[in-house]
UniProtKB/Swiss-Prot annotation:
This is Elongation factor G. GO terms for cellular component: cytoplasm. InterPro entries: EFG_II, EFG_III, EFG_III/V, EFG_IV, EFG_V-like, EFTu-like_2, G_TR_CS, P-loop_NTPase. Keywords: Cytoplasm, Elongation factor, GTP-binding, Nucleotide-binding, Protein biosynthesis. Belongs to the TRAFAC class translation factor GTPase superfamily. Classic translation factor GTPase family. EF-G/EF-2 subfamily. Catalyzes the GTP-dependent ribosomal translocation step during translation elongation. During this step, the ribosome changes from the pre-translocational (PRE) to the post-translocational (POST) state as the newly formed A-site-bound peptidyl-tRNA and P-site-bound deacylated tRNA move to the P and E sites, respectively. Catalyzes the coordinated movement of the two tRNA molecules, the mRNA and conformational changes in the ribosome. It comes from Leptospira borgpetersenii serovar Hardjo-bovis (strain JB197). Its main location: cytoplasm. The lineage of its organism: Bacteria, Pseudomonadati, Spirochaetota, Spirochaetia, Leptospirales. It is found in: Cytoplasm. GO terms for molecular function: GTP binding; GTPase activity; translation elongation factor activity. GTP binds at residues 24-31, 91-95, 145-148. Residues 15-291 form the tr-type G domain. CDD domains: EF-G, EFG_III, EFG_mtEFG1_IV, mtEFG1_II_like.
């Protein structure tokens, strides 16, 4: 750790710590920006481009796969110093298939930089990332990047921030020139012009604002003061007296940002080395320190009551494992310390299973390299070795029994069957699956009890492709993969009664249980998959067997009768039944519940639901016809098309079942000039012809069972 920070008292050290994420739509230049930040803060001594000719790749893209594809898959952690402050940076993926990485890193950050492309503006994944930041109350500044590119228009992007993301977006800079003429930025707080000259933009020249920009700068300066004064009475009074200071303005902007009521907007081009150092100043000036953020935990001794943790190193330890990685040094667990102090040699307890662990080695991470340290305090993000745990586990020193609230994990929407080409690789396949499912909660695996096949599930084709590739590279396992399968669901559309009596007499104690009631669809707005309501009165079913009926119902949810997929959106109400003093049992009522459910389900007009994806396609306007045609052919419903500067953006909803192989089709129909992203939107009923086809297929595959 740098001595500059080590000398401060812990509270002072905390005030000078920033835990930030850099989040964006894919290809907005996020990893390039991180690379420049590391360069200007002396963490690296040469710049390598993401897809550079030197073949080195960006520092933060440490997996071979990432360097080849030029996309960031795992969020690498690193730290740097800037003007006596420590900045911990999590570089997060921009591809929608890797949103769990973004969710995870936002969970442990105090604030973030939202990177936007100066040409494309707010894109679908920018909206997803912004929604995730909102979920975790992450204050953010925006950086409009790529202003050196043809068609760049930062003010249009600011309007999109306001309209699409509903941000109170306020520029704190304006660019000096655009496209090939981009030279620097005007700072609207200091009202000075800054030029980035010399090799790699290291030489920053402060000058007066150019005459042709004075009018615009004054106008935007007034707008900034108006916006900032909403968060500071001191600034409002100073403005009335005509004596506002830079410090007052910065303090007001900082307050608005941390309260999530304002988004300061910075500008530049990371690739052309313009504006990055001023953005770093903005991180220190406007983004939250660990002290500014309220982190909550659930008190396990007090009915999971919410408590607020203090960023204080003298309090009992609470930390969260937010990422696991198998590196060249063994299993690494990335940890954020929220309260207390974590030291080498101390004993910590995993709150999910009460297991004790001894802390053997602590490190600060710089992508895939590391630096050993003796201790870490509240606010630090570090890595531990040899701790067996799952992502999202909470650790304490045993003095507190609390757990951090669990992270929101989206359900997988796609599955594939896999098998090892050679039986000698089965052991390695099991190891790989065990590790990857621990690392990534959206990557799931199970063995189909009927076919005996191993099935992997994930967030999209690319997500599963990356894991298949990693199994090959890291474990030497060649796989045979089946066709991707859609995660269909089954539900009911009307209310239906059930009344089933289970009777069995085979000498000795028999089995008896009667269950009666009805099932009905749960309205979509309730977002419940299943609900059980007990309205039995007068002891028609004894209290101890009510749970047995519920268990029987639940056992039916895994496999519907239409095509064998899970059942959702069903409320089961029991209102009558019967029992026998001798023959009734837990098992008898479970079986009665199971058959009663099937009886009701088949009468309640069941239907098949399919995942509908929100798809966004960006490409040159000349290909708009081809893009619309390709979506219409896939049962797509066009929601919106916008056209700006010879570029068109098409938003549509398309069933996932029709999106397989779309990237190849899009590439060939637009000469590789269009790109698309998709994310899960909702479940919707499949058309009748598709439902009939699916049921026919299911019957053929399962005819031996009946």
């Amino acid at each position: 750790m740098s001595t500059a920070v080590a000398e401060f008292k812990p509270s002072e050290k905390l005030l000078k710590t920033r835990n930030i994420g850099i989040s964006a739509h894919i290809d907005s230049g996020k990893t390039t920006l991180t690379e420049r930040i590391l360069f200007y803060t002396n963490r690296i001594h040469a710049i390598h481009e993401v897809r550079g000719k030197d073949g080195v790749g960006a520092k933060m893209d440490s997996m071979d796969l990432e360097r080849e594809r030029g996309i960031t898959i795992q969020s690498a952690a690193t730290y740097c110093q800037w003007k006596n402050h420590t900045i911990n940076i999590i570089d997060t993926p921009g591809h929608v298939d890797f949103t769990v990485e973004v969710e995870r890193s936002l969970r442990v950050l105090d604030s973030a930089i939202l990177v936007l492309c100066g040409v494309a503006g707010v894109q679908s994944q920018s909206i997803t990332v912004d929604r995730q930041m909102r979920r975790y109350n992450v204050p953010r500044v925006a950086f409009i990047n790529k202003l050196d590119r043809t068609g760049a228009n930062p003010f249009r992007v600011i309007e999109q921030l306001k309209e699409k993301l509903k941000h109170n977006a306020v520029p704190v800079q304006i660019p000096i020139g655009l496209e090939n003429d981009l030279k620097g930025v005007v700072d609207l707080v200091t009202m000075k012009a800054y030029y980035f000259e010399g090799k790699d933009g290291m030489d920053i020249q402060e000058k007066e604002i150019p005459d042709d920009l004075k009018e615009l700068a004054n106008k935007k300066h007034e707008e900034l003061l108006d916006a900032a004064s909403m968060f500071s009475d001191e600034l409002t009074e100073a403005l009335l007296e005509g004596t506002p200071t830079e410090e007052m303005i910065k303090k007001a902007i900082r307050t608005g940002t941390i309260e999530l009521k304002m988004t300061p907007v910075f500008m530049g081009s990371a690739f052309k080395n313009k504006g990055v150092q001023k953005l770093l100043d903005g991180v220190l000036d406007y983004l939250a320190s660990p002290v500014d953020v309220k982190n909550k935990a659930l008190d396990q001794n007090n009915n999971e009551e919410m408590i607020v943790l203090e960023s204080n190193y003298e309090k009992p330890l609470v930390c969260l494992a937010f990422k696991l990685e198998d590196g060249r040094y063994g299993q690494l667990t990335y940890v954020r310390v929220y309260q207390g102090k974590l030291s080498k040699g101390m004993t910590i307890y995993n709150m999910s299973n009460n297991k004790k662990h001894n802390v053997g080695r602590l490190c600060r991470m710089h992508s895939d390299e590391m630096e050993d340290i003796d201790s870490a305090e509240a606010g630090d993000i570090i890595a531990l070795f040899g701790i067996d745990c799952a992502s999202g586990d909470t650790f304490t020193d045993g003095k507190l029994k609390v757990s951090m609230e669990s992270m929101f994990v989206p359900a997988p929407v796609i599955s594939l069957t896999i098998e090892a080409k050679e039986s000698k690789h089965l052991n390695n396949l099991a190891k790989a699956l065990n590790r990857f499912t621990k690392e990534d909660p959206t990557f799931q695996t199970h063995v189909d009890p009927e076919s005996g096949q191993t099935i992997i599930k994930g967030m999209g084709e690319l997500h599963l492709e990356v894991y298949i590739e990693r199994m090959k590279r890291e474990y030497g396992v060649e796989l045979i993969t089946g066709a991707p399968q859609v995660a269909y669901r089954e539900t009911i559309t009307s209310k239906a009664d059930f009344d089933y009596t289970h009777k069995k007499q085979t000498g000795g104690q028999g089995q008896f249980g009667r269950v009666a009631g009805y099932m009905e669809p749960i309205p979509l707005e309730e977002t419940l998959d299943y609900d059980f309501v007990n309205k039995v009165v007068g002891g028609a079913i004894p209290r101890e067997y009510i749970q047995s009926v519920d268990k029987g119902f639940k056992s039916c949810l895994e496999r519907g009768s239409l095509i064998g997929f899970p059942i959702i959106g069903v409320r089961c109400v029991i209102n009558d039944g019967a029992y026998h003093d001798v023959d009734s049992s837990d098992m008898a009522f479970q079986i009665a519940g199971r058959y009663a459910f099937r009886q009701g389900f088949n009468k309640a007009n069941p239907q098949i639901l399919e995942p509908i994806m929100k798809v966004e396609v960006d490409g040159p306007s000349e290909f708009q016809g081809a893009i619309l045609g390709s979506l219409n052919q896939r049962r797509g419903m066009i929601l919106n098309t916008t056209e700006e500067d010879a570029y068109c953006k098409t938003e549509a909803e398309v069933p996932l079942a029709d999106m397989f192989g779309y990237s190849t089709v899009l590439r060939s129909s637009t000469q590789g000039k269009a790109e698309f992203s998709m994310e899960f939107s909702r479940y919707a009923p499949v058309p009748r012809n598709v439902a009939e086809e699916l049921m026919k297929k299911y019957k053929v595959n399962n005819k031996d069972e009946d």
